[in-house]
Curated annotation (Swiss-Prot):
Signal peptide: none annotated. The keyword Amino-acid biosynthesis does not apply. Disulfide bonds: none annotated. This is Probable GTP-binding protein EngB. Residues 26-200 form the EngB-type G domain. InterPro entries: G_ENGB_dom (IPR030393), GTP-bd (IPR006073), GTP-bd_ribosome_bio_YsxC (IPR019987), P-loop_NTPase (IPR027417). GO terms for cellular component: cytosol. Keywords: Cell cycle, Cell division, GTP-binding, Magnesium, Metal-binding, Nucleotide-binding, Septation.
């Protein structure tokens, strides 16, 4: 049975420059990843109904740390450093990418990935790399096409269908939905997916503990 979590009770735990500074690697985490201007922080704030839980910046690329938020005991959301922003100094970009890659490859509690991309400019190279990596390690993915309010209904549906078809060859557990923090489009779909991931995995872990 799917448990419904109260995301409005989510609270900030810690910011860390890399995996070594994070909390103990247990429980369940779902990470939010995306280009630096994809609206990641806005999506987290909308999900949790908290205006400043995740810091939003007028300058994309300011989220340089891995940020952890607790939904419930052992259940966490993770805001990963934004990727692909051209105006960030190269040395800093490499540092972020290293921290991002290390988290994705070594964090055992990571059980789901939300990839956010602007609905008007979806599936850039780095977005596809992120999805392919998740598929390779059998991690389920929810793609959120953000800023959906910027398009009329017909154009929005066309983009949604285009991306859904484009990810089919990836052969993974990938769901694609339109999303808008401003108009609250797709927030229910995001909540349902997170509830499903967290509930399924908690049930499996409880069974393993009982053995």
């Amino acid at each position: 049975m799917t448990q419904q979590y109260n995301y409005h009770m989510t609270r900030f735990i810690i910011s860390a420059p890399d995996i070594r500074h994070l909390e103990t690697d247990n429980g369940i985490e779902v990470a939010f990843a995306g280009r630096s201007n994809a609206g990641k922080s806005s999506a987290l704030n909308t999900l949790t109904n908290q205006k400043s839980l995740a810091r939003t910046s007028k300058t994309p690329g300011r989220t340089q740390l891995i940020n952890l938020f607790q939904v419930a005991e052992g259940v966490r959301l993770v805001d990963l450093p934004g990727y692909g922003y051209a105006e960030v100094p190269e040395q800093m970009k490499i540092k972020w990418q290293r921290a991002l890659g290390e988290y994705l490859q070594k964090r055992n509690s990571l059980k789901g990935l939300v990839v956010l991309m602007d609905i008007r400019h979806p599936l850039k190279d780095l977005d596809q790399q992120m999805i392919l990596w998740a598929v390779d390690v059998k991690l389920p993915v929810l793609v959120l096409l953000t800023k959906a309010d910027k398009l009329a209904s017909g154009a929005r549906k066309a983009q949604l269908n285009m991306v859904r078809e484009a990810v089919l060859p990836f052969m993974g557990d990938i769901q694609v939905e339109a999303f808008s923090s401003l108009k609250k489009i797709g927030v229910d779909k995001l909540q349902q997916k997170l509830d499903n991931w967290f509930s399924t995995l908690q049930h499996i872990e409880e069974e393993q503990d009982a053995e």
